[in-house]
UniProtKB/Swiss-Prot annotation:
Gene3D superfamilies: UbiA prenyltransferase. Its EC number is 2.5.1.141. It holds the Pfam family UbiA. It comes from Opitutus terrae (strain DSM 11246 / JCM 15787 / PB90-1). This is Protoheme IX farnesyltransferase. GO terms for biological process: heme O biosynthetic process. HAMAP family: CyoE_CtaB.
Length: 295
């Protein structure tokens, strides 16, 4: 652990605390929900949505690191985070996180839509009050976290339409099922780190990796089926349907290769990168379809 005084924290240290790259995923999926709802063009509302979701995601990231700074200090992957590295004081991280979360809720409620604020509140509480503590005691922590991570499209959809219709809930399902193989691949790769801090997640408990791989495959298959529902329900054209089918089958193939014991470690990395490629491709196709192709 670094001995750098937290009182010397720089702006870059606080920015790192908000995990801007990871927070961008929440912002982008909220934008997908907003654009897929096809509301009347309102650049001010769109900018406020981005600002509100950015603040919420950054605040949650800061508070999560405040809650987990003890375990972060004992894992190689997280030991360099601002709090365990001594760059930011725990009290400062707490204050920053609380202010960002409260500010985001106020902004979204007053200037965007109350339902968007409600889904943001659900995101904050499900992540910090359910997922973060569950990592210490539950094998199902990944799935609990996937619930929290699937709310941003609903934030965007409710901001655009004032309610959530069928396609919005499909987006929730897509984000949920996508996260399971994504984080299973990460957790399998870093299972020794998680074992060192006694997180009882499936990749720690399943030494062979057979159940990890099977569970990843099941959720990837569920993702493929869920992603095709908009086409089956007449909510998109074949442009999106083909994109969802091709990318979904490619993702599924990587999950199948993860089932092979001899190459499981290498396959986990490939599954991770496949998940990174899958999401922007399928969500980008959905936005293009909804904005320009659906009558």
């Amino acid at each position: 652990m670094s001995t750098t005084p937290a009182s010397n924290a720089k702006f870059s240290d606080y920015l790192e605390l908000t995990k801007p790259r990871l927070s961008m995923l929440s912002v982008m999926t909220a934008l997908v929900g907003y654009l897929a709802a096809r509301p009347p063009w309102d650049p001010i509302q769109l900018a406020l949505l981005v600002l509100g979701t950015s603040a919420a995601a950054g605040g949650v990231a800061a508070l999560n690191q405040w809650l987990e700074h003890d375990t972060d200090a004992h894992m190689k992957r997280t030991a360099d985070r601002p709090i365990p590295a001594g760059k930011v004081a725990t009290g400062s991280a707490f204050v920053l996180g609380v202010l960002m979360c409260i500010g985001s809720l106020f902004l979204l409620y007053a200037l965007v839509h109350p339902l968007a604020a409600l889904f943001t509140l659900l995101t904050i509480f499900s992540y910090l009050g359910w997922y973060t503590p569950a990592k210490r005691w539950s094998r199902w922590s990944t799935e609990i976290g996937a619930v929290a991570g699937a709310f941003p499209p609903l934030i965007g959809w409710s901001a655009g339409e004032g309610r959530v219709t069928a396609l919005g809930w499909v987006l929730f399902g897509v984000l949920f099922f996508w996260q399971v193989p994504h984080f299973m691949a990460v957790a399998w790769t870093y299972r020794k780190d998680y074992s060192a801090v006694h997180f009882p997640m499936l990749p720690v408990r399943d030494e062979s990796g057979e159940r990890v791989a099977l569970w990843s495959l099941i959720n990837t298959a569920a993702l493929l089926v869920t992603s095709l529902l908009p086409l089956l329900w007449g909510l998109t054209t074949w442009f999106y349907g083909v994109a969802a089918a091709v990318t979904g089958l490619w993702f599924l193939w990587q999950a199948i290769k993860f089932m092979q014991p001899a190459t499981r470690d290498r396959a986990a990395r490939k599954l991770f990168f496949a998940s990174i490629g899958y999401l922007p491709l399928v969500l980008g196709a959905l936005v293009i379809d909804r904005l320009f192709l659906v009558s």
